């Protein structure tokens, strides 16, 4: 079934946002474009995987309370490994696989930056095989976190 004009415009907008995001990451970190891979993983598949690991920090809404835990986690990952990382633009969610060394060297960009995270307070950093991960999700009751 052919795409409608509205669907084509939406897809073009999504591709444009993805291109802009990748260009921004390259400009801010110096990582090579061929070191960045777009992942087809879904947000729901990540939630399904970490659901039983999530711990609610009741009445805590500031994700920055987890920043030091993120720093410890990222420092424990070999610089030669890749992590799937969550990004949110104006109206799209993307998962990009990046060298962990790039994230280590630009922790502020990947944790705090409104440039690449939009208004999202969620943070997701996982290995492709789900053997290790660090997830902070914002909910109506507080933040939910998981590290494994």
List each model region and its residues:
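Structured alpha/beta or helical-core interaction and ligand-binding surfaces enriched in interleaved
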Residues: 1-141, 147-148
